């Protein structure tokens, strides 16, 4: 696959911020953390799939960092959109990040499962990026069934919002997170991922990147 520019969405910005926060709080644990995928299916056009294990035993901290990252990213959206997305996900923007959210309560109801994710068939759904660009979809195992649930819920909402590359290219280069933050302040559009041209089933097992 030829080298292409990444098509930025709030999905990417959120997950990058969240992973950075997790890395800053990394504590050696005995948590078993692995992702087993028997089959990846979906509709893809110029998409890349990344599988990441990032484990920690403190589920409460995982959720706190998750909410912090979420609030940072959506704070640059119009207030109406911020509140709509937060309500859909189950996060009260009036609460402090460390508060137990509705999202966390709902996800913890499913936490009595093995922290090894065993997905026999993973349906990515639809993913499409413009010619010459690619969209990165990340699957992250935090080592907690509850936190994984929260992560998936947030990503499903944020993956619908993207940052136009033309705006990003006009800005001077700084730290990547600062650059993207300024780009979002300038303009953010909400779009539905569409114009899918092909359906396929992909076999994936224990890799790092999968390009389609």
From Swiss-Prot:
It is found in: Virion membrane. Pfam families: L1R_F9L (PF02442). It comes from the Viruses. Keywords: Disulfide bond, Late protein, Membrane, Transmembrane, Transmembrane helix, Viral envelope protein, Virion. InterPro entries: Virion_mem_poxvirus_L1. Residues 1-175 are virion surface. It is a single-pass membrane protein. Disulfide bonds join 33-55, 47-127, 107-149. Disulfid bonds are oxidized in the cytoplasm by OPG088 protein. Unglycosylated because produced in viral factories instead of the classic ER -Golgi route. Its main location: virion. The chain crosses the membrane at residues 176-196. Coiled coil: none annotated. One of its GO terms (cellular component) is virion membrane. Residues 197-212 are intravirion. Component of the entry fusion complex (EFC) composed of OPG053, OPG076, OPG086, OPG094, OPG095, OPG099, OPG107, OPG143, OPG104, OPG147 and OPG155. Except for OPG095 and OPG052, each of the EFC proteins is required for assembly or stability of the complex. Component of the entry fusion complex (EFC), which consists of 11 proteins. During cell infection, this complex mediates entry of the virion core into the host cytoplasm by a two-step mechanism consisting of lipid mixing of the viral and cellular membranes and subsequent pore formation. Belongs to the orthopoxvirus OPG053 family. This is EFC-associated protein OPG053. The gene is OPG053.
């Amino acid at each position: 696959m030829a080298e292409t520019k990444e098509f930025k969405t709030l999905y990417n910005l959120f997950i990058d911020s969240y992973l950075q926060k997790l890395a800053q709080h990394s504590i050696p644990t005995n948590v078993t953390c692995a992702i087993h995928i028997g089959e990846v299916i979906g509709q893809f056009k110029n998409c890349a799939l990344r599988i990441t294990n990032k484990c920690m035993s403190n589920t409460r901290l995982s959720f706190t960092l998750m909410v912090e990252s979420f609030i940072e990213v959506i704070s640059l959206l119009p207030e109406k959109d911020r509140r709509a997305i937060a309500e859909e996900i189950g996060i009260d923007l009036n609460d402090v990040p460390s508060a137990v959210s509705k999202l966390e309560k709902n996800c913890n109801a499913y936490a009595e499962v093995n922290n090894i994710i065993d997905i026999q068939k993973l349906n990515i759904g639809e993913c499409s990026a413009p010619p010459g660009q690619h969209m990165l979809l990340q699957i992250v195992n935090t080592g907690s069934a509850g936190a994984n649930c929260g992560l998936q819920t947030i990503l499903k909402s944020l993956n619908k919002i993207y940052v136009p590359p033309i705006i990003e290219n006009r800005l001077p280069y700084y730290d990547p997170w600062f650059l993207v933050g300024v780009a979002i302040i300038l303009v953010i559009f909400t779009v539905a991922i569409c114009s899918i041209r092909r359906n396929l089933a992909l076999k994936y097992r224990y890799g790092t990147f999968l390009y389609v």
